[in-house]
Amino acid sequence: MSETADASHSPTLPLPPPKNTFQRIAGVLFAPASTFEDIARKPDVLVPMLLILVIGYINTFLMMPRMDWNAVSEAQIEAIKAKNPQMTDADLERVSRMTQAFGKVAGWFGPLFGIVWWLIMAGVLLLAFRLMGGQGTFKQALSTVLYSWIPMVIYYIVVTIVAVGRGKIDPTHMVTVVKSNPAFLVDMKEQPILFSLLSNFDVFTIWMLVLLIIGCAAFSKTSRAKAAAIVLSLWAVMILIKTAFAAMAAAKMKVKTT
């Protein structure tokens, strides 16, 4: 009787102190299960987000001078000429300048657009898991998204290194600068739909998805199998939407050239 009472009143072991941001970054790469459990207990957002943004702007600073915006504007001008051959050279020059200006502005704002994307990802994931009976808060979901984004940070660092060594790069071919997905096996202009579809199956994207599954299972208190079903279903929907847009763009270009 006394042994039972002693056992019921035995003190529980205290939880280890939460890891700092750099320990968590290393942890999601080498020990993701325990690290995401730690993130779920005490999520953090500001420091990892700032680190990703700083690295993103370093990459942008190195990449922007190497972007061949002329190639983008020339391709657009060819499409415009095919549809409106009566356009004057002055009009085409104005379109070229606007295209290049927009590309440069979008490039510098790219890392900031990432914040919007992370917020959307966190909101959609949290909603999906809550609808499926899971738990969690928005802060847990956002922290999970940020730490799961580490493989993409590594990807952009690799892309930057390759771009710096290569010189000028056509921005429309950025997805195949690093041969980490099978899209490089097809020509983007000849098979735009297949190119868009294959670009989704990237090694770094799959790595990120695996981390998302582990992290979402941790904060939502669901099984990894259920987390995988939810995350991969949402990814499949995103692929369908992206491929549909590629198909519409291809159909539009086909109409212009006929």
Per-segment meaning from a language model:
Residues 21, 34-156:
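Selected alpha-helical membrane-embedding segments in polytopic membrane proteins
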Residues 30, 122-126, 209-211:
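A generic alpha-helix surface/boundary motif
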Residues 139-255:
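Hydrophobic alpha-helical transmembrane segments and adjacent short intramembrane/lumenal linkers
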Residues 11-16, 102-106, 191-195:
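Short juxtamembrane and helix-loop transition motifs at transmembrane-helix boundaries
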Residues 1-19:
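Low-complexity, intrinsically disordered extramembrane tails and loops of integral membrane proteins
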Residues 16-27, 96, 192-193:
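Coil-to-alpha-helix initiation sites in intrinsically disordered, low-complexity, charged segments
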